[in-house]
């Protein structure tokens, strides 16, 4: 069974330091750790954060052949904790590799078909990525 996970990989900038995050990236890593054949689809930056994300996804067994290597920066989510320990997030989205979806680099659904397609989370609401992915997904 082939599973395609499409969506953001980003860097959570925590008070203790940066870590690779993003709901879809975490989903892909979890599925790969469970032994599934998983390919991740997203724009991944060639900056230091992007290279760190690629390394972690690869280490966990996530296929990256369908991911786009981009010169744009990695999306970040800066995490702030209040006095009760509740988190708030400030996202750097605009102009990042993470949301640079273009139909020209997405896999051709006429040639390749996954058994399962998972699309989440922020890419489903951030334009133009959400429209590009919706139009592509209905063909899968």
Each predicted region: which residue ranges?
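Ribokinase/PfkB-type carbohydrate-kinase core domain
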Residues: 1-3, 56-58, 64, 83-140
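Substrate-binding N-lobe of the ribokinase-like
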Residues: 3, 15-77, 81-86, 94-98
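Generic enzyme active-site microenvironment
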Residues: 6
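Catalytic metal-binding/acid-base residues of hydrolase active sites
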Residues: 10, 45, 123
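General secondary-structure edge motif
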Residues: 11-12, 36-37, 120
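Short, solvent-exposed loop/turn segments at secondary-structure junctions
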Residues: 12-13, 126
């Amino acid at each position: 069974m082939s599973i395609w996970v499409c969506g953001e990989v980003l860097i959570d900038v925590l008070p203790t330091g940066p870590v690779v995050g993003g709901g879809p990236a975490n989903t892909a890593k979890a599925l790969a750790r469970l032994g599934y054949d998983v390919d991740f689809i997203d724009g991944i930056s060639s900056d230091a954060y992007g290279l760190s994300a690629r390394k972690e996804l690869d280490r966990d067994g996530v296929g990256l052949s369908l991911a786009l290597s981009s010169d744009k920066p990695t999306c970040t989510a800066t995490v702030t904790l209040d006095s009760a320990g509740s988190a708030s997030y400030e996202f750097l989205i605009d102009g990042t590799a993470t949301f640079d979806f273009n139909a020209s680099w997405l896999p051709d659904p006429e040639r390749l078909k996954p058994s399962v397609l998972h699309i989440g989370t922020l890419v489903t609401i951030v334009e133009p990525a959400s429209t590009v992915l919706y139009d592509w997904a209905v063909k899968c």
